[in-house]
Structures are given as structure tokens and as C-alpha cells.
Design a protein with these regions (language model features):
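N-terminal "arm"/small-domain region of PLP-dependent enzymes with the aminotransferase-like
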Residues: 1-62, 291
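Active-site phosphate-binding strand-loop segment of PLP-dependent enzymes
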Residues: 146-247
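Hydrophobic/aromatic ligand-binding patch that stacks against planar heteroaromatic rings
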Residues: 130-131, 184, 302
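Phosphate-binding glycine-rich loop
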Residues: 66-116, 129-134, 140
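Active-site region of PLP-dependent enzymes
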Residues: 198-206, 216-307
Length: 307
């Protein structure tokens, strides 16, 4: 005997039960009491996230899919950038943000082994780790107290002819002095990577223009780990307004593949078998050309649904 007339009816009933489950067993209906400890960070969700997760689970599309595509579109529109790409963690976002700047496609501006990157002396390891991993040299600048953000008066002293980039995080929702840092980067033609994992939604104003943190530099990164402002459980995002960096972000995220056509759509660009790549024979399938060392750092659609 069939329980439902069609799949849509089944999904609606299942999600209705999930909603009722949340309201009965998960919703916090108790008032805070005097002297109760309030967590500075924790997961925050309601029946909407649980229903979206249920929807993705019923799709059973286990890798990046429609929910990820929708999130990337909505997130980029909200934060105010042209391109945003989900990854499996904020640490992966930080890794990719640095990896793309080592690409030979960037010419003289690429970061090579031995080049220097100015960063903050007080921060999280994954802001620093990719610098060391790719053979560059971190140049540490101290923080100011009580802001615990980079002391911009010490930037000039940290600069040398080997400096290629500045990579720093906004601390606990408090933006660093973006105006001073950006002027410094513009003066010396340096890349600026904003680690925005702790500060999603913070705003900063320069000359009357107000923007979200993470959008003033060349690349911004966010983390969606449970203690952050928005959660997927695990997840992160890399975003930029630079079309070349956007292509490289996709390449490094998707195994180092040169082709950035939409996954699951055959010959989306219309030039899959028309190119000549290195020493490969002419007409070699572009979908299987790998121009960079990369990783599989995509997010699952179930995580994206929670976001």
C-alpha cells in the first residue's frame, strides 16, 4: 500500500514531521536566568535548517549540487562580490586563497619560494600555515592592544623587496585598519588576502563607501564551522571580484583541473575537444587536463543546505 500519491507529497509530510520534531524537542523555550553563563559562540539553527537538510538528504546528491549553487549565488550577492565558491572548511578556504597566488598564470606577481608575506603575530594557525607550506616566508607584525589586530604603524618596517602579499585576519568581529593596510598594499602593488573567518557581516567604511569585511582585498575567506557567525557544520568559502583569481580558485578546488565548466554538464563551454595543451595531442579532452597541483575541496550539498 502506498503512503503517498507522489514524491512532493511525501517530502512535504516528512518535512512537516521534522518541523514538529524541532519545535517539540530542540527549540529553546526557556528564559535565561540570572548569572547563567552565555556561550560567546555556538551553533544556532531552527526548523528551517533541519528541513533544508532533510530536503538535501532526500535528494541524496552527495557532492556539490543545487544547494551549493544556490548558496554561492545568494552569498556573493549579499556580501557584494562577483564570485564566491564553497569549500569543505575555512582552513581549505585559506589554503586555496594562498595557492592561487602561486600560479604561474599571475606572471611576475606570483608568489614564489622565498618570497615574503606580511602577516599578524597573533592569530589562528591556518592563516599562516599555507604561507609556510608553499615555501614563502611569513613576516610577523605585532598586534595593538586591546584591539588585537595588526599594528599598522609597523607595516613599513616589515616591508622588503621580497614582499609579495599581506595576509591577515579580522579579530573576533573587529575589522583591522583596512584603509591603512589597503593603502600600504596599493603603494607596493601587494596582494591583500582578508581572512574573514571570525568577522562575517562586519562592515568597514572608506571615503564614504561602506562594504563588508572580506571584500576590500583581492581575496576573502570565510569559515562555517559551528562557532562562527553562520554554520554548515564544516564548510568555508573563497570569494573575489577578480575574474582570473576566480578561475584559479575553481581550478585548485577541483583537483587542479584546467576546465572550469559546471560539473555534470557535458561540454558546457562548447570547446571541450578543440584546444592544444602543452605536449598533449591537439583535441585532447579539456575536462581531463590538469594544469595545477590541486585538491578535491568541494563541500557536500547537505552542508550547503544547512548554510
Amino acid at each position: 500500500m502506498k503512503l503517498w500519491n507522489n514524491e512532493n507529497e511525501a517530502r512535504d509530510q516528512i518535512k512537516k514531521l521534522v518541523r514538529e520534531y524541532y519545535l517539540q524537542f530542540k527549540a529553546n523555550k526557556e528564559e535565561f536566568f540570572d548569572r547563567e553563563r552565555i556561550a560567546y559562540a555556538k551553533r544556532v539553527y531552527d526548523e528551517n535548517e533541519m528541513c533544508a537538510l532533510t530536503d538535501a538528504m532526500l535528494d541524496f546528491w552527495l557532492t556539490t549540487g543545487r544547494f551549493a549553487k544556490q548558496f554561492e549565488h545568494d552569498f556573493s550577492k549579499w556580501i557584494g562580490v562577483r564570485y564566491a565558491h564553497l569549500v569543505n572548511s575555512g582552513s581549505s578556504a585559506n589554503l586555496i586563497a594562498f595557492m592561487v597566488l602561486t600560479s604561474s598564470e599571475l606572471g611576475e606577481r606570483r608568489i614564489r619560494r622565498g618570497d615574503e608575506v606580511i602577516t599578524v603575530a597573533c592569530g589562528f594557525p591556518t592563516t599562516i600555515a599555507p604561507i609556510i607550506q608553499y615555501g614563502a616566508v611569513p613576516v610577523f607584525v605585532d598586534v595593538s592592544v586591546p584591539q588585537y589586530n595588526i599594528d599598522v604603524t609597523k607595516l613599513e618596517k616589515a616591508y622588503s623587496t621580497k614582499t609579495k602579499a599581506v595576509r591577515i585576519a579580522h579579530t573576533l568581529g573587529n575589522p583591522f585598519d583596512i584603509e591603512a593596510v589597503k593603502k600600504f598594499c596599493d603603494k607596493y602593488n601587494l596582494w591583500l588576502i582578508e581572512d574573514n573567518c571570525d568577522s562575517l557581516g562586519s562592515e568597514y567604511e572608506i571615503n564614504g563607501e561602506k562594504r563588508y569585511t572580506g571584500t576590500w582585498g583581492d581575496i576573502g575567506t570565510s569559515s562555517f564551522y559551528p562557532p562562527h557567525h553562520m554554520t554548515m557544520g564544516e564548510g568555508g568559502c573563497v570569494y573575489t571580484n577578480n575574474s582570473m583569481l576566480d578561475k584559479l580558485i575553481l581550478t585548485y578546488r577541483d583537483w587542479g583541473r584546467d576546465c572550469i565548466c559546471v560539473s555534470g554538464q557535458d561540454n558546457f563551454c562548447g570547446h571541450r575537444f578543440e584546444g592544444k595543451y602543452g605536449e598533449l595531442p591537439e583535441g585532447y579532452d579539456h575536462k581531463y587536463v590538469y594544469s595545477h597541483f590541486g585538491y578535491n575541496l568541494k563541500v557536500t550539498d547537505m552542508q550547503a543546505a544547512i548554510g
